[in-house]
Amino acid sequence: MNRPPEEYVHVTEDKLLAFAVACFESAGLDHEHAHTIGRLLVNSDMRGVRTHGTRAVNRYCRAFEEGNTNPQPDVRQIHEAPTGVVIDGDGTLGYLPMVRATEAAIDRASKLGL
């Protein structure tokens, strides 16, 4: 039977976020990019979805360090329409492009009165 551990190490949200951001910065990400990914991973942990949380930090940092994923992407809009955008993530993980796309969608929706 799969049982959770009986003893835990408790880490505050702020310390976990600071650790994740520091790991990503040491792998070559700028602060905004590191904080964006770190915040989203910590949010997953805080919701109890640990499969999509900070357990991925090591794997993601390795991908950045080994050149499999772009740590300094030029994330940009390559197409726009009144209700949507297409974002080029330039070979990075989807977190930063997704946040930028969401921000653009919110902006467009507000301009349309939604």
PLM segments and residue spans:
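Active-site cofactor/substrate anionic-group-binding motifs, chiefly glycine-
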Residues: 52-106
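Glycine-/proline-rich flexible loop or hinge segments
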Residues: 21, 44, 48, 81-91, ...
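N-terminal and secondary-structure boundary signal
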Residues: 4, 25-28, 43-50
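Flexible, glycine/charged-enriched surface loops at secondary-structure junctions
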Residues: 29-36, 51-53
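A non-catalytic, amphipathic alpha-helix used as a structural packing/dimerization or gating element
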Residues: 15-19, 36, 104
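Conserved catalytic cysteine-centered active-site region
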Residues: 104-114
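Generic N-terminal amphipathic, Lys/Arg-enriched alpha-helix
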Residues: 1-27
